[in-house]
Amino acid sequence: MISLKSIVDKLYNLEDLSYQESYQLFDYFIKGQIELPSQTSILTALKLKKETSIEIAAAVEALFDNTKEFPKIKGDLAGIVGTGGDGFNTINISTTAAIVAATAGYKVAKHGGRSVSSKSGSFDLLESFGVNIELAPDQTKQCLELYNLGFLFVPFYSDGFRHIKEARTILKTRTIFNILGPLINPARPNKVVIGVYSKDLILPMAKTLVNLGIDRAVVVYGSGLDEVAIHDDTYVAEIQNNQIIEYKVSPVDFGIDTYAIKDLEGGLPEQNREIIKQILLGKGKEAHNAAVAVNVAMLMKLYDKDDLKQNTQEVLEIIKSGKCFNTLQQVINYSNK
């Protein structure tokens, strides 16, 4: 076993960790074997050094090895998730996109927790709607099979995350755990859209996904946002057949107008709840609908639907039908049986 001191010394010298060292470090983290002052300094050192794809992949495996198993789902399973930490406090676009994608017929497993760095995390929003976020894995699997949508609450699958919650709160900034969050979905989706909070993270995240054997994925950075942008360019790394292709898209590629970031500002869970409810009922503002639609359109690309404009129009029609709220209501009812 590699000692914590030797690992920490390397980090303080801003040296990259080996796969084994990173695995051991995050095994210590998740088992609560690192004191709070050391946690904050280690996370800060990793951030200053910049995390490598090897360190991230090793951390993912360590966390998976300490996570409750989720029953295997037949066929394709999608994930739409952001790292968080972009600092803009927009409405919960990835959560809404997951509900819309499920309504469009794609099975989506949404893994997340309550807010760490924003005013309203994805599961804060779900709770405000009345979703029981602590379903057992077999119940969540059945929900996925019935309604194409399942919510996996982080603390339910890995209670070790409680050991690092205080350090993340103290730091009040994004850390490697923002990067790890989208990668440790216990349902193990094979088609994922991951938004990152920094352009510098696109390639490390994409390389990590290749190392983890993900079938199809896109990593996106939306000019300040950890999702596909409607205000400016979105930088993309697409993964197919273990190859990474980098490109850039803009609102015009989706056939939509350009909007301002302020058009997407969110608030407290109750405020977000009302905004999201209106979107799902087909009564949302144009900017809100567009933001959700482009993110679902990008997911559809992973199912060999390459025409982003057509994808976006299809999604906008589904949103405007109001059927998406029915999907959420079915999940709410199922989760409270």
Swiss-Prot record:
GO terms for biological process: L-tryptophan biosynthetic process. This is Anthranilate phosphoribosyltransferase. Anthranilate 2 binds at R168. Homodimer. The keyword Magnesium applies. Binds 2 magnesium ions per monomer. Belongs to the anthranilate phosphoribosyltransferase family. GO terms for cellular component: cytosol. Keywords: Amino-acid biosynthesis, Aromatic amino acid biosynthesis, Glycosyltransferase, Magnesium, Metal-binding, Transferase, Tryptophan biosynthesis. Mg(2+) 2 binds at D226, E227. Its cofactor is Mg(2+). Mg(2+) 1 binds at S94, E227. Catalyzes the transfer of the phosphoribosyl group of 5-phosphorylribose-1-pyrophosphate (PRPP) to anthranilate to yield N-(5'-phosphoribosyl)-anthranilate (PRA). 5-phospho-alpha-D-ribose 1-diphosphate binds at residues 82, 85-86, 90, 92-95, 110-118, 122. It comes from Francisella tularensis subsp. mediasiatica (strain FSC147). GO terms for molecular function: anthranilate phosphoribosyltransferase activity; magnesium ion binding. Its EC number is 2.4.2.18. It catalyses: N-(5-phospho-beta-D-ribosyl)anthranilate + diphosphate = 5-phospho-alpha-D-ribose 1-diphosphate + anthranilate. It is an enzyme of class 2 (transferase). The keyword Metal-binding applies. It holds the Pfam family Glycos_transf_3. Pathway: Amino-acid biosynthesis; L-tryptophan biosynthesis; L-tryptophan from chorismate: step 2/5. Anthranilate 1 binds at G82.
